[in-house]
């Protein structure tokens, strides 16, 4: 089975990925889990309904397993749900020898990791992602919940014991969720590898390809790209910020939509178009943005922007971005495909780019 090793400064751990990863690691994993005093599984309503039986079968021989089922979507990454999970942990009597399993998409991985990082100052946890999007969020140790004023504003860096990535779960993902996760695969290609981007564009040309083509080698490459960056910079003091390409504008848009109007990958797609447009202005980026947007449309993405989204709200949200320092908004731009840079953008440039993007496609968000 393909295995990728993540070598962060604080911990080294494996990422297991294939179509039957849960079954393939079952014996070794359950032996490890049996050493803990209690196994606590955090999942959401949708994953519990579809896939709980699969995880139950793997954990069947363990003496003590408790589930917490969170609401679906970004609603789970709130103070209210975080407090409720903590209450459940305390009432259940989990001690420091317990372990948490985050079983779900990126939201559950973020929430579960943050719960594990903060319960009794930290207990071990495993990531068992079930979505394409989670190939990015499950690796690297970023864990967080949202604040009404910004996405992932309350969080930590806390690495899992392992990531068990069973791609059989993708079969039940709606097309919109597949597309959202695929956006992060596009991001990894843009910041690292023109050849990878071309391979994605040649392989995936319509929505059904998400289900009929093999995503695994592309997911592996994306995880390898992220693992290499995390090995250099675990806590985002430097190059790890490159992984935020498209996220400064994207997170601002998510916040404007109250973390529900757009899925994460949908917002990041708009953010990547915005960042590519600014990269053309600042660095003369040699990139066929029109071809790129046409490809995105073929895959079902909406690439047009709605002029009714108020710039002042987006700018305010961008100021709350974690890369913003001394009130200067930091953008991840591209000098060329595979060559990201951090650029301090002034308000005038942010507005001019906003207007340019609107001119190139409006009334679509």
From Swiss-Prot:
<dbReference type="GO" id="GO:0046872">
    <property type="term" value="F:metal ion binding"/>
</dbReference>
<dbReference type="InterPro" id="IPR030963">
    <property type="entry name" value="DHQ_synth_fam"/>
</dbReference>
<keyword id="KW-0170">Cobalt</keyword>
<feature type="binding site">
    <location>
        <begin position="169"/>
        <end position="172"/>
    </location>
    <ligand>
        <name>NAD(+)</name>
    </ligand>
</feature>
<keyword id="KW-0028">Amino-acid biosynthesis</keyword>
<keyword id="KW-0057">Aromatic amino acid biosynthesis</keyword>
<feature type="binding site">
    <location>
        <position position="264"/>
    </location>
    <ligand>
        <name>Zn(2+)</name>
    </ligand>
</feature>
<feature type="binding site">
    <location>
        <position position="151"/>
    </location>
    <ligand>
        <name>NAD(+)</name>
    </ligand>
</feature>
<comment type="pathway">
    <text>Metabolic intermediate biosynthesis; chorismate biosynthesis; chorismate from D-erythrose 4-phosphate and phosphoenolpyruvate: step 2/7.</text>
</comment>
<feature type="binding site">
    <location>
        <begin position="106"/>
        <end position="110"/>
    </location>
    <ligand>
        <name>NAD(+)</name>
    </ligand>
</feature>
<dbReference type="InterPro" id="IPR056179">
    <property type="entry name" value="DHQS_C"/>
</dbReference>
<keyword id="KW-0479">Metal-binding</keyword>
<keyword id="KW-0547">Nucleotide-binding</keyword>
<dbReference type="GO" id="GO:0008652">
    <property type="term" value="P:amino acid biosynthetic process"/>
</dbReference>
<dbReference type="Pfam" id="PF24621">
    <property type="entry name" value="DHQS_C"/>
</dbReference>
<dbReference type="GO" id="GO:0003856">
    <property type="term" value="F:3-dehydroquinate synthase activity"/>
</dbReference>
<feature type="binding site">
    <location>
        <position position="142"/>
    </location>
    <ligand>
        <name>NAD(+)</name>
    </ligand>
</feature>
<feature type="binding site">
    <location>
        <position position="247"/>
    </location>
    <ligand>
        <name>Zn(2+)</name>
    </ligand>
</feature>
<feature type="binding site">
    <location>
        <begin position="130"/>
        <end position="131"/>
    </location>
    <ligand>
        <name>NAD(+)</name>
    </ligand>
</feature>
<dbReference type="GO" id="GO:0000166">
    <property type="term" value="F:nucleotide binding"/>
</dbReference>
<dbReference type="InterPro" id="IPR050071">
    <property type="entry name" value="Dehydroquinate_synthase"/>
</dbReference>
<protein>
    <recommendedName>
        <fullName>3-dehydroquinate synthase</fullName>
        <ecNumber>4.2.3.4</ecNumber>
    </recommendedName>
</protein>
<dbReference type="GO" id="GO:0009423">
    <property type="term" value="P:chorismate biosynthetic process"/>
</dbReference>
<keyword id="KW-0520">NAD</keyword>
<keyword id="KW-0862">Zinc</keyword>
<keyword id="KW-0456">Lyase</keyword>
<comment type="similarity">
    <text>Belongs to the sugar phosphate cyclases superfamily. Dehydroquinate synthase family.</text>
</comment>
<feature type="binding site">
    <location>
        <position position="184"/>
    </location>
    <ligand>
        <name>Zn(2+)</name>
    </ligand>
</feature>
<dbReference type="InterPro" id="IPR016037">
    <property type="entry name" value="DHQ_synth_AroB"/>
</dbReference>
<dbReference type="InterPro" id="IPR030960">
    <property type="entry name" value="DHQS/DOIS_N"/>
</dbReference>
<dbReference type="Pfam" id="PF01761">
    <property type="entry name" value="DHQ_synthase"/>
</dbReference>
<keyword id="KW-0963">Cytoplasm</keyword>
<dbReference type="GO" id="GO:0009073">
    <property type="term" value="P:aromatic amino acid family biosynthetic process"/>
</dbReference>
<comment type="function">
    <text>Catalyzes the conversion of 3-deoxy-D-arabino-heptulosonate 7-phosphate (DAHP) to dehydroquinate (DHQ).</text>
</comment>
<dbReference type="GO" id="GO:0005737">
    <property type="term" value="C:cytoplasm"/>
</dbReference>
């Amino acid at each position: 089975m393909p295995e990728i090793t993540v070598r962060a400064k604080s911990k080294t751990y494996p990422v297991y990925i294939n179509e039957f990863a849960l079954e393939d690691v079952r014996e070794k994993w359950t032996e490890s889990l049996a050493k803990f005093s209690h196994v606590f599984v955090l999942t959401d309503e949708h994953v519990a309904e579809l896939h709980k039986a699969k995880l139950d079968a793997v954990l069947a021989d363990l003496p003590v397993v408790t589930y917490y089922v969170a609401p679906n979507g970004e609603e789970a990454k709130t103070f209210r749900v975080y407090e409720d999970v903590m209450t459940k942990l305390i009432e259940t009597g989990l001690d420091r020898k317990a372990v948490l399993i985050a079983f779900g998409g990126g939201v559950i991985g973020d929430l579960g990791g943050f719960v594990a990082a903060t319960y009794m100052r930290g207990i071990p946890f495993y990531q068992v992602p079930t979505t394409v999007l989670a190939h990015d969020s499950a690796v690297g140790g970023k864990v967080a919940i949202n604040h009404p004023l910004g996405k992932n504003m309350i969080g930590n860096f806390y690495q899992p014991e392992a990531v068990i990535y069973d791609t059989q779960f993708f079969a039940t993902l709606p097309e919109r969720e597949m597309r959202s996760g695929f956006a992060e695969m596009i991001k990894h290609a843009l910041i690292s590898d023109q050849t990878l981007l071309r391979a994605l564009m040649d392989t995936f040309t319509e929505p059904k390809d998400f289900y009929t083509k093999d995503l695994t080698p592309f997911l592996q490459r994306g995880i390898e790209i992220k693992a290499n960056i995390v090995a250099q910079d675990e806590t985002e003091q430097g190059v790890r910020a490159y992984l935020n390409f498209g996220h400064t504008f994207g997170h601002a848009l998510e916040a404007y939509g109250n973390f529900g109007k757009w899925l994460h990958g949908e917002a990041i797609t708009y953010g990547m178009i915005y960042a590519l447009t600014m990269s053309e202005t600042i660095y003369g980026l040699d990139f066929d943005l029109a071809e790129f947007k046409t490809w995105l449309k073929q895959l079902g993405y909406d690439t047009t922007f709605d002029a009714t989204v108020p710039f002042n709200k987006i700018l305010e949200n961008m100021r709350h971005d974690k890369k913003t320092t001394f009130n200067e908004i930091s953008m991840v731009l591209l000098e060329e495909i595979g060559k990201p840079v951090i650029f301090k953008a002034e308000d005038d440039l942010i507005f001019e780019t906003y207007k340019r993007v609107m001119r190139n496609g409006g009334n679509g968000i």
